[in-house]
């Protein structure tokens, strides 16, 4: 809801779009000014497109720029996750608490940032793995290779540092040594 073009026809969700027909990039603006019925229409269209293209439900619901944690969008995301019977990403304790109260599944802990410096260097990964709390933790990562598609992203070149960190043999060894079980959202119970 905060980057690119919608799946829905622009005329059906005008409160979500700028004059060029693209989503406003500001999650707080979207939460404050987007019409809830238009948010729901677009989210349903995105899920329907996912199911049509992949032939299955998504493993979880997530939102770019964390827009899904802001009311009233959060309630729409929660209702859709309930309807689909799938978990969701919860970036903060308040969202996790609210999701848990509704019986929604989510990792118990969330770690990650996307600022001017790469977050998941090998050193930071090793430090987090050494002090990982009990339960399921999500590490929000943005690994990748810098290319023309990322020139205008504020988190472009940092992706290569994260890719190196996540594929560092020392990180894999730390995961094995600590008997950490890697999983995906579809495995949350």
Language-model features: where?
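Terminal accessory/targeting
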Residues: 1-60, 68-189
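Active-site histidine-anchored catalytic micro-motif
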Residues: 65
